[in-house]
Every structure is written in structure tokens, then in C-alpha cells.
A protein has these predicted regions:
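Acidic/His- and Gly-rich active-site-bordering loop/insert found
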Residues: 2-97, 101-122
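Histidine/acidic-residue-rich, glycine-tolerant segments that coordinate divalent metal ions
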Residues: 61-64, 84-97, 101-102, 119-196
Length: 196
């Protein structure tokens, strides 16, 4: 598998990827109520040979799909598919103001494209659908329940005003601080403490 083969495989899936985006767009649902979109995405993954768990971690509209391709790392893509109130044609309607229909389509598109090369990949392709990203933060719920603990790498796509390859955000980068010192009670034994 090389880049040209990947591009060709993606091109061959383009109509299906657009169909995914249109379905999710046309069935805009609020967070934790994405039953139609969740079911559609799950069925699409099953059609391509993925084994699916839904609901996932007791979250009704979360799912986890896997395609085992041999020993190796587990690499996940993370679709979002909830919508927001007040952005539809009428101000009280639900719509995809943040492009979650596109996020769902692009992440599934990446997984389905890689699935075409399952005999050439070592590892597992994982798709973890996170509900309620605009409200309660479905990815946080999944993380707090251990849903990413066995994942070696996770990829997320999002719309923006420009095409960027290198972006630093606090949510995507981590910084670790280590403080060294000696703890003591500030009132009883302040002289025994060493500030970090």
C-alpha cells in the first residue's frame, strides 16, 4: 500500500463518504439523542466488516467498532455526530452548525479506506463514536470509563477556516510537571519542609 493506492481507494469511496455526511446532516439530533445517526454509522461499519459494540460503556448513542488486521497497535478515529439547537432553517430547529456531519463522514471515510488494505496492515482499526460532544462531552465520558485505555493512537478531524497541518491546542498537547521537595506542616514544622 502506498499513498497513490490510498488516494484511489478513498476516491472509490467518495460517493459513500458523501452519503454518510448527507445522512447525518439531514438527521440532525441533539447530544445523547443521536439514535438515527448512531444506528446508521454502526450499520455502515458492519457492512465493511467491522465488529461493533453499541451501546458502548452504557452510553446509548456511543459505539466502538473494530477491524482486526493482525498483531500490532490499535489506532482509533473518533467521529462526532451530534447537532445544536437553534441553527436550523428556523431558529428553533436543530442543525449541524459545527460540521459534525463532516467529522462523522471523514473519520468513517478514513477507517473504511484503511479497511480496504486490511491484509497489508498490522494492527486494529478502531472507530469510537462519541455522542454529545457539544454538551456533556462524550469523549470525556468514554475516557472516564476507560474506553480509550487500550488505544495506542487516536485521530480526530475538525473543520476550520483554513487547512492546517500543525496546530497546538491545550486539548491536544500535554505538559507534565514534576515537583520535588519535602512535605511538612506549615504551622507545626515549617523548617522541615523544602519547597518544590
Amino acid at each position: 500500500m502506498n499513498k497513490e493506492e490510498l488516494y484511489l481507494a478513498e476516491d472509490n469511496l467518495a460517493a459513500e463518504i458523501e452519503e454518510i455526511s448527507e445522512f447525518v446532516f439531514n438527521h440532525a439530533e441533539l447530544g445523547s439523542e443521536e439514535f438515527k445517526s448512531c444506528k446508521y454509522l454502526v450499520e455502515k461499519l458492519k457492512e465493511h466488516g467491522f465488529t461493533v459494540t453499541c451501546p458502548y460503556l452504557d452510553l446509548d448513542t456511543a459505539f466502538r467498532a473494530e477491524l482486526y488486521c493482525g498483531e500490532g497497535p490499535k489506532v482509533a478515529v473518533l467521529p462526532e455526530y451530534d447537532a445544536l439547537p437553534g441553527y436550523g432553517p428556523n431558529k428553533d430547529e436543530v442543525a449541524h452548525a459545527c460540521g459534525h456531519n463532516w467529522i462523522a463522514a471523514s473519520t468513517l471515510g478514513a477507517a473504511l479506506t484503511l479497511a480496504k488494505f486490511k491484509d497489508q496492515i498490522n494492527g486494529t482499526i478502531v472507530v469510537i463514536g462519541a455522542p454529545a460532544e457539544e454538551t456533556t462531552g462524550g469523549k470525556c465520558d468514554i475516557a472516564n470509563r476507560g474506553g480509550y485505555d487500550d488505544i495506542d493512537a487516536a485521530l480526530q478531524f475538525h473543520l476550520g477556516a483554513e487547512n492546517n497541518m500543525n496546530i497546538m491546542t491545550l486539548a491536544m498537547d500535554s505538559i507534565e510537571f514534576r515537583f520535588q521537595g519535602t512535605a511538612s506542616h506549615a504551622a507545626a514544622y515549617p523548617e522541615k519542609g523544602v519547597n518544590a
